[in-house]
């Protein structure tokens, strides 16, 4: 398993398990997390994102669909699923996460709703 695939498996397993210690261990102290809506900074950023999902949804989980290493980044196609606490409606949305790693830890995470935008971001961030 490649470093990127291993990292993706471990970080999303930690998110699904709500394992705060593992999330902190897998991310750098200066990680920058940019969702499609807002930005967060620091390891608590992923935990805040996870908690926001738990506040809005029952059974909030993330399913990995595809992991690819591209231009020095880890590009993860994933699906978030849950059931709305207020409405009871099943919700699933498809996102692409682009991770940058340093020494095996996440230093940045950018969310995209479109794969081509994610690929462009990875290539541009790598200077290509």
Task: Give names to the regions the model predicted.
Residues 80-82, 101:
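Hydrophobic beta-strand positions in extracellular immunoglobulin-like domains
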Residues 96-120:
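Short beta-strand edge/turn micro-motifs at domain boundaries
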Residues 1-26, 69, 123-128:
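Short, low-complexity N-terminal intrinsically disordered segments enriched in polar/charged residues
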Residues 71-80:
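A short hydrophobic beta-strand element
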Residues 34, 77, 109-110:
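Beta-strand residues in well-ordered beta-sheet regions across diverse protein folds
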Residues 20-24, 28-72:
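A solvent-exposed, acidic/Ser-Thr-rich amphipathic alpha-helical stretch
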Residues 59-62, 91-96:
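Short, surface-exposed coil-to-beta transition loops
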Residues 82-90:
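Short, cysteine-centered beta-strand-loop-beta hairpins and adjacent loop/turn segments enriched
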């Amino acid at each position: 398993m490649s470093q990127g695939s291993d990292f993706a498996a471990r970080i999303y397993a930690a998110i699904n398990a709500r394992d705060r210690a593992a999330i902190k261990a897998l991310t750098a102290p200066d990680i920058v997390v940019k969702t499609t809506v807002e930005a967060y900074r620091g390891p608590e950023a992923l935990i805040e994102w996870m908690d926001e999902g738990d506040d809005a949804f029952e059974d909030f989980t993330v399913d990995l669909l595809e992991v690819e290493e591209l231009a020095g980044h880890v590009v993860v196609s994933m699906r978030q699923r849950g059931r709305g606490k207020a409405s009871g409606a099943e919700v699933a949305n498809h996102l692409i996460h682009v991770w940058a790693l340093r020494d095996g830890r996440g230093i940045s995470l950018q969310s995209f709703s479109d794969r081509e935008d994610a690929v462009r971001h990875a290539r541009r961030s790598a200077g290509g």
